[in-house]
């Protein structure tokens, strides 16, 4: 009974916080409520018995990404920027994206994961029978490196492409921008560095 009450509490609070994230105009408040959503999801994962996933979610999303978003928003001082477009302009695209998302969920539930089961779930194991012989981390690692090994490698390639893209963007330099050259600064003569100018009165 207590777990059911906690489940409804965390799920309801997460839904309310998520709605505030997309409805509030102040970006600082939006990021704060996003952090609250992450905390509620951590509570739901703890109720499901996934301690490792909950702590990983807390460290990665709350401790790194959400705090980074909050610092960036506070540094850029975006809280006074007003929305130039109307509400119906954003509501149309938001409704379109939500309809596509719900349609994809409907297809996945009706297809019973036929694509995933035919390629990745052939070697699945009944983990309920071995619940007391394996820890949560061992079960997660076994499933990740056996049944979902292809998806794990694909996610690694996605991260590699993101890293290479960031490096390529930083390597591009414009010729019009003046930059400091340490080699030129070191070899300069002291006599040519300091110059005295006399101003006529």
UniProtKB/Swiss-Prot annotation:
Name of the protein this chain belongs to: NADH-ubiquinone oxidoreductase chain 6
Xref: Pfam families: Oxidored_q3
Lineage top rank: taxon: Eukaryota
NCBIfam families in the record: PRK06638.1-4
Localization (cell): Mitochondrion membrane
Major location category of this protein: mitochondrion
Annotated InterPro entries: NADH_UbQ/plastoQ_OxRdtase_su6, Nuo/plastoQ_OxRdtase_6_NuoJ
Keywords: Electron transport, Membrane, Mitochondrion, NAD, Respiratory chain, Translocase, Transmembrane, Transmembrane helix, Transport, Ubiquinone
Residues that span the membrane, as ranges: 4-24, 28-48, 55-75, 88-108, 151-171
EC code(s) of this entry: 7.1.1.2
Catalytically driven reaction(s): a ubiquinone + NADH + 5 H(+)(in) = a ubiquinol + NAD(+) + 4 H(+)(out)
GO molecular function, one term: NADH dehydrogenase (ubiquinone) activity
Record's function text: Core subunit of the mitochondrial membrane respiratory chain NADH dehydrogenase (Complex I) that is believed to belong to the minimal assembly required for catalysis. Complex I functions in the transfer of electrons from NADH to the respiratory chain. The immediate electron acceptor for the enzyme is believed to be ubiquinone.
PANTHER family associated with the record: NADH-UBIQUINONE OXIDOREDUCTASE CHAIN 6 (PTHR33269:SF17)
Membrane topology designation: Multi-pass membrane protein
Cysteines engaged in disulfide bonds, as pairs: none
Family: Belongs to the complex I subunit 6 family.
GO cellular component: mitochondrial membrane
């Amino acid at each position: 009974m207590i777990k059911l009450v906690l489940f409804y509490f965390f799920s309801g609070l997460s839904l309310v916080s998520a709605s505030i994230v997309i409805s509030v105009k102040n970006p600082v408040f939006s990021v704060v409520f996003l952090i609250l959503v992450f905390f509620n999801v951590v509570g739901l994962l703890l109720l499901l018995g996934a301690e490792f996933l909950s702590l990983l979610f807390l460290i990665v999303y709350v401790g790194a990404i959400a705090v980074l978003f909050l610092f960036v928003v506070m540094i850029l001082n975006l809280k006074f920027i007003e929305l130039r477009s109307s509400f119906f302009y954003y509501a149309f695209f938001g409704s379109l994206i939500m309809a596509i998302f719900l349609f994809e969920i409907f297809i996945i539930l009706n297809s019973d994961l036929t694509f995933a089961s035919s390629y990745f779930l052939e070697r699945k194991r009944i983990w309920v029978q071995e619940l007391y012989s394996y820890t949560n981390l061992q079960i997660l690692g076994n499933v990740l490196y056996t049944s979902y090994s292809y998806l794990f490698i694909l996610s690694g390639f996605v991260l590699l492409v993101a890293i290479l893209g960031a490096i390529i963007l930083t390597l591009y330099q414009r010729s019009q921008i003046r930059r400091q050259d340490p080699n030129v600064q070191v070899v300069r003569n002291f006599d040519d560095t300091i110059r005295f100018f006399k101003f006529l009165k």
